[in-house]
């Protein structure tokens, strides 16, 4: 099915609205903030699947700017801007690597670097309101990386469900592309 400009524009508007709803809810619903941010990130993948990489990037940028305008607590949107919002884009690019072992290695290094930066460089800014156990940083990074790989796996399952259910295409692999 050929995607018209009207279809792409409409889909972008719907994905942007849903993304903002999840970001906004994540900013004030206690206990499930990260779940809501993770759900908000799925719409970037939908845009990439339906319109290409440019559509996913545009959605991320629009949601980040609109979120900063709409969400009352500006720090509440930080997890979306710093990780969840662009993860679909990163996943798409990493999964273009032909070797599965290399893909996993790059993802682990990406998550570890991001967690290291967050825990060592910007702990108060990014995690100020989140209680983190007083474990050595290396254990927190290792545990966080395992959790992010689980997030990546679930993200892949949801993408595959979307493709089978809404695009009605076969799946040959667990790739976003």
Residue ranges of predicted features:
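Hydrophobic transmembrane alpha-helices
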Residues: 2-47, 55
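Alpha-helical transmembrane segments and their cytosolic interface
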Residues: 5, 137-177
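Hydrophobic alpha-helical transmembrane segments
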Residues: 9-13, 35, 57-61, 78, ...
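Interfacial aromatic-anchored transmembrane helix boundaries in multi-pass membrane proteins
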Residues: 24-33, 64-93
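Membrane-helix interface "capping/anchor" motifs
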Residues: 47-58, 95-101
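Mid-bilayer segments of alpha-helical transmembrane spans in multi-pass integral membrane proteins
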Residues: 73, 108-124, 145-153
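Short helix-perturbing small/polar motifs within transmembrane alpha-helices
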Residues: 81-116, 120
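Membrane-interface helix termini and inter-helical loops of multi-pass transporters
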Residues: 123-136
């Amino acid at each position: 099915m050929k995607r018209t400009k009207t279809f792409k524009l409409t889909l972008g508007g719907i994905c942007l609205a849903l993304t903002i709803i999840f970001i906004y809810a994540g900013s004030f619903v206690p206990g499930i903030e990260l779940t809501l941010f993770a759900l908000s990130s799925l719409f970037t993948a939908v845009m990439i699947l339906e319109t290409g990489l440019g559509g996913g990037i545009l959605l991320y940028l629009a949601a980040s700017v609109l979120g900063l305008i709409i969400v009352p607590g500006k720090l509440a949107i930080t997890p979306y801007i710093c990780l969840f919002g662009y993860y679909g884009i990163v996943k798409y690019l990493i999964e273009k690597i032909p070797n599965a072992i290399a893909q996993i290695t790059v993802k682990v290094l990406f998550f570890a670097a991001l967690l290291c930066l967050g825990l060592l460089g910007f702990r108060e800014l990014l995690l100020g309101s989140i209680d983190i156990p007083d474990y050595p940083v290396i254990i927190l990074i290792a545990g966080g990386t395992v959790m992010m790989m689980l997030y990546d796996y679930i993200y892949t399952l949801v993408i595959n469900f979307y493709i089978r259910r809404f695009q009605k295409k076969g799946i040959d692999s667990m790739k976003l592309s």
